[in-house]
Amino acid sequence: MLGEIQDKVYKGTTTVGLVCKDGVVLATEKRATMGNFIASRRAKKIYRIADRVAMTTAGAVGDAQFLARLISVEIKLYEIRKEEKPTVKAIATLLSNILNSVRWFPYFVQLLVGGVDKRGPSIYSIDLLGGAIEEIDIVATGSGSPTAYGVLEDRYTPEITVDDGVELAVRAIYSAMRRDSASGDGIDVVKITKDGYFELSKEEVDKILSSLRRA
C-alpha cells in the first residue's frame, strides 16, 4: 500500500548538508519526478523556517510544503510564548515529534534541518518516522545521495569554511546529477553563519559549476 502511494507522488531527490567551522551549508537540486516522468524542473527543496535555520526536503513535494508551513508557524508561536528563538535542536525535536505522531500514515519525506544558534552550527537528519540524528560533519539524502557521499567523504575536512563548503556542496550535487536520473535541472545553495542567512544567486552557482566543468 505504501509503495503504491509513493509511486504516485512527486518525489524529491538529492540534498546535502555540511557542518563547517563558521556555519552550515545546505544544497539541493531542483528536479521533481513522478516515476520516470519529470514533473517539474523548478522544485523548491530548501525552505527558510527561522532566522538562521533552513530545512531541506527529499520525498513527496506536497508533504514537504505542508511541513515547511507548519514548522514555520510553530517556530513563530514558540518565539512569542518563550520570548526567545528556538535552537536548531529544539526545531528538529519538534519536527521529529510531528512525524512520529503520524507514523501509521507518514509524511513521505526525509529532512535536513540546519542552522546556527547559541550552541554554534548544527545539522539534523530526520526520517519519515521521526528519527532524528545530529550530523557532526556531512550528510546527504535522496536517490542521488550515494554519489554525493563519495564526493563529500573525499574532500570534507572539519576545518572547512562555509565558502569552501559551498563549492564542495555544489560539486557533490553536480556529481549526483550526472549519475542519478532523478536529479537535475539546477542547484539551490544556502549558507548560514552567525552573521545571517545567505542564498546564492543563480549566477553565483553557475560560476562554481563552470569552474567544475573546466577542471
UniProtKB/Swiss-Prot annotation:
Q: Which InterPro entries match?
A: Ntn_hydrolases_N, Pept_T1A_Psome_bsu_arc, Pept_T1A_subB, Proteasome_bsu_CS, Proteasome_sua/b, Proteasome_suB-type
Its EC number is 3.4.25.1
Q: Which CDD domains match?
A: proteasome_beta_archeal
Source organism superkingdom: Archaea
GO CC terms: cytoplasm; proteasome core complex, beta-subunit complex
Give the pro-peptide residues.
Answer: 1-12
User: Where is this protein found?
Assistant: Cytoplasm
Per its record, the protein catalyses: Cleavage of peptide bonds with very broad specificity
Major location, coarse class? Answer: cytoplasm
Q: Which family does it belong to?
A: Belongs to the peptidase T1B family.
Its quaternary structure?
A: The 20S proteasome core is composed of 14 alpha and 14 beta subunits that assemble into four stacked heptameric rings, resulting in a barrel-shaped structure. The two inner rings, each composed of seven catalytic beta subunits, are sandwiched by two outer rings, each composed of seven alpha subunits. The catalytic chamber with the active sites is on the inside of the barrel. Has a gated structure, the ends of the cylinder being occluded by the N-termini of the alpha-subunits. Is capped at one or both ends by the proteasome regulatory ATPase, PAN.
Summarize the protein's role.
Component of the proteasome core, a large protease complex with broad specificity involved in protein degradation.
Tell me which HAMAP family the record gives.
Proteasome_B_A
Q: What is the protein name stated in its UniProt record?
A: Proteasome subunit beta
Lineage, broadest ranks: Archaea, Methanobacteriati, Methanobacteriota, Archaeoglobi, Archaeoglobales
Q: What gene does the UniProt entry assign to this protein?
A: psmB
